[in-house]
Amino acid sequence: MTDHIGTFIQVTGNDFDRKFAMDNMDIRFADNGALAGKSITYGISLNNNPTVQDPFNTLNGWKFPYMASELAPSPAASPLINGVLGQQVLGATAYAFYDKSLYAEVGGYKTLSRSLRNKINAGEDGSISGVSPYWRLSYFKDMGAQNLRAGFFGMEVKLQPDFLSGPTDQYRDIGVDAAYQFLGSGENIFTVNTSYINERRTLNSSFAGGSASNLHGNLTRFDLAGSYHYLNTYGVTLGLFDTRGNKDDALYNTGDADAGSINSSPNSRGYTVQADWTPWGKKSSWGAPYANARLGLQYTGYTKFNGGKNNYDGLGRDAKDNNTLFAFIWAAF
């Protein structure tokens, strides 16, 4: 847009529900300067999904898998910061990257109105009371042919699940993440990304209304992904994920086919493996760097789903019944 203002706006459509929806959005101001004799890049981001503005590939906004099937069932539970609030909120954050090594960000989020969410086909997971604070701190070390990074992040949310006044469900999400990347000469590229989120819950509204059996609860999420790419053309990635939390009969044993848990448990774990081909990824490609396309085959398997391996919903469905093979073509302009 200008030398200091840029936008990223993503609109997604699929044949499953035959609708287009507002996806990720990031509008930001950025500038460079100096502080105490060191370089600093700073700015402000206006975005609709906590973590979508993050510059690294370990948080939900940009972590592996980068796309997935719209048809496949998903586990019933996930920490709020792990994508639950995406497209339903609008937030502003201020960030700074100091001396090409220390990244810090702080801001807050509010939910969009219910009518606006309906117009842009966003989800309806309740309404945030007040402003939900978000923070991020990360250290980055660039060593030329390789780099590594480690950081912290978190968010606190007071959510009214029924869009009414009164008590709120309170969530405190705190996470750690780390990454390593080997670039070498650009021929063989390896990456490892990992994150862990711990969510503490006090479900004042849900407990009072009978939709939760326990006032207090917890939920954790662990992700680990490793990838190898040859000449930026041929690649393979393996990701592992594990979600665990306390049992809650009213919250998870809904009796729903596919989505319920006869064990009243949110525990789910599995893996995703992907092979992909980027035909114009080489530096010598005729289309580099403007022709961007990727063809891939992705398989997601579950060893546990909503608290069980076999008959997890009480209606005969096993965890492996949610395994999904997904083929895709990804193009960017």
Region spans (language model):
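Membrane-embedded beta-strands of outer-membrane beta-barrel proteins
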Residues: 25-27, 92, 134-137, 150, ...
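Outer membrane beta-barrel
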Residues: 1-114, 129-145, 180-183, 222-245, ...
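Transmembrane beta-strands of outer-membrane beta-barrel proteins
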Residues: 8-10, 43-47, 105-109, 151-155, ...
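Outer-membrane beta-barrel translocator domains and adjoining extracellular loop/strand segments
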Residues: 20-26, 56-61, 116-124, 160-168, ...
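Sequence/structural signature of outer-membrane beta-barrel proteins
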Residues: 12-16, 34, 49-53, 111-120, ...
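Detector for outer-membrane/organellar transmembrane beta-barrel domains
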Residues: 145-281, 286
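Outer-membrane beta-barrel "beta-signal"
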Residues: 273-279, 319-333
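Transmembrane beta-barrel outer-membrane domains
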Residues: 18-22, 83-87, 126-132, 167-173, ...
